[in-house]
Swiss-Prot record:
PANTHER family to which the protein is assigned, alphabetical: ENOLASE (PTHR11902:SF1)
Cofactor names: Mg(2+)
Gene for this chain: eno
UniProt keywords, alphabetically: Cytoplasm, Glycolysis, Lyase, Magnesium, Metal-binding, Secreted
Sequence similarity: Belongs to the enolase family.
GO cellular component: cell surface; extracellular region; phosphopyruvate hydratase complex
Protein name: Enolase
Length: 414
């Protein structure tokens, strides 16, 4: 048995220049694992707490409290634990915090330790992380959900919907699917420049131009897909992030106020006109009646993903399954606080035929943990931004490495 011999954490920077937690775990044989915790901008109200210092440093965004919690409170409790018993470690972290949302220690403290320990254990066994976490059945390369036009909370523009994405289904390998996205992305930049639009990038590497409405980005994507020669092989996915513009029982966008029913009909019209295969957070996180209606209307036609709705929480997802809200769940480890809790949510979804989408956050780093995690859990889909900015391409490049060992791309079988 190898045990945890040393734990330490310190501040590093994420892709927005804000501090975040980096944790390092050393085992009794000298194996080391490290992990950097991401941070979201558009967040669900029921997410696990990201502990910030709220003082004068970094505009209040420092994480020295979370770092101290790792170096003192957590380290004292987990030194000597079996490094290969991830469940025991994560349950210990949860019990040590004593709340249901990590409001004492901070999910940015617990997740960093959880991820770093998994990495150290994999290193000790000489295994890639995806194989250690997923076992012999970890083999499926996910279909990327690439966010190439940014809006909402991820961009400084006038577009309400947060993400306009493309999904390359019609390919037999991950590398060929990724190539199609690259080619479409390059064409999109030229289209925007030629039409006098900004080619500035949003938080997730997608372009962030001002556009007439929430339909114009879809038209742009359709034009670029056609010019690249990938019609019928690449589809469109949307992250509406509608909680961000929901107020007083209405959805305020494009200068108008929409009811839930109005917005659902808008989605029905969009799906009839465009090859849309997935809509994420189409309604607000607490608009439960609306979610039930949306699922009744479109749930047998397209993927309806709950992000703010479920926040990677097993108990909340279970309620959603019972009420028949959505048919897929976004998986963000930092929403729930440990690797084990994340895996439990994925397994619950898969047992109930809900699809899973592994996801980054808008505040990211060069850490590619979620690439391995997506393969480990056979989620079949991954969201990790556009093919720009190193914190995004790190995940794609890691998946290209994994493909050298495991070449089953889900593609049209999704």
């Amino acid at each position: 048995m190898l045990v945890i011999e040393d734990v330490r954490a310190y501040e590093v920077l994420d892709s927005r220049g804000n501090p975040t937690v980096k944790a390092e775990v050393t085992l009794s044989d000298g194996s080391v694992g490290a992990a950097i915790v991401p941070s979201g901008a558009s967040t669900g109200s029921k997410e696990a707490l990201e502990l910030r210092d709220n003082d004068e440093r970094f505009g209040g965004k420092g994480v020295l409290k979370a770092v101290a919690n790792v170096n003192e409170t957590i380290a004292d409790e987990i030194l000597g634990l079996d490094a290969f018993n991830q469940t025991q470690l994560d349950d210990t972290l949860r019990e040590l915090d004593g709340t249901n949302n990590y409001s004492n220690l901070g999910a940015n403290a617990t997740l960093g330790v959880s991820m770093a320990t998994a990495r150290a254990a994999a290193a000790a066994l000489g295994m890639p992380l995806y194989r250690y976490l997923g076992g012999a059945n970890a083999s499926i390369l996910p279909v990327p959900m690439c966010n190439i036009i940014n809006g909402g909370a991820h961009a400084n523009n006038n577009v309400d919907f947060q993400e306009f994405m493309i999904m390359p289904f019609g390919f037999t390998s991950f590398k060929e699917a990724l190539r199609s996205v690259c080619e479409i992305y390059v064409i999109l930049k030229k289209e925007l420049a030629n039409s006098g639009h900004s080619t500035a990038l949003g938080d997730e590497g997608g372009f962030a131009p001002n556009l007439a409405n929430n339909t114009e980005p879809i038209d742009l994507l359709m034009t670029c897909i056609k010019k690249a020669g990938y019609e019928n092989r690449v589809k469109i996915a949307l992250d509406v992030a509608s909680t961000e513009f929901f107020k007083d029982g209405k959805y305020h966008m494009e200068g108008k106020a929409f009811s839930s029913e109005d917005l659902i009909e808008r989605y029905v019209e969009l799906c009839a006109k465009y090859p849309i295969c997935s809509i994420e957070d189409g309604l607000a996180e607490n608009d439960f009646e609306g979610w039930i209606k949306l699922t009744e209307k479109l749930g047998n036609k397209i993927q309806l993903v709950g992000d703010d709705l479920f926040v990677t929480n097993e108990d909340i997802l279970r309620e959603g399954i019972i009420k028949k809200m959505a048919n897929a769940v976004l998986i963000k480890p930092n929403q729930i606080g440990t690797i084990t809790q994340t895996m439990r949510t994925v397994r619950l979804a898969q047992r109930n035929n809900y699809k899973c989408v592994m996801s980054h956050r808008s505040g990211e780093s060069e850490d590619a943990f979620i690439a391995d995690f997506a393969v480990a859990l056979n989620t079949g889909q991954i969201k990790t931004g556009a093919l720009a900015r190193g914190e995004r391409t790190a995940k794609y490049n890691r998946l290209l490495e994994i493909e050298l060992e495991s070449d089953e791309y889900l593609g049209e079988k999704l």
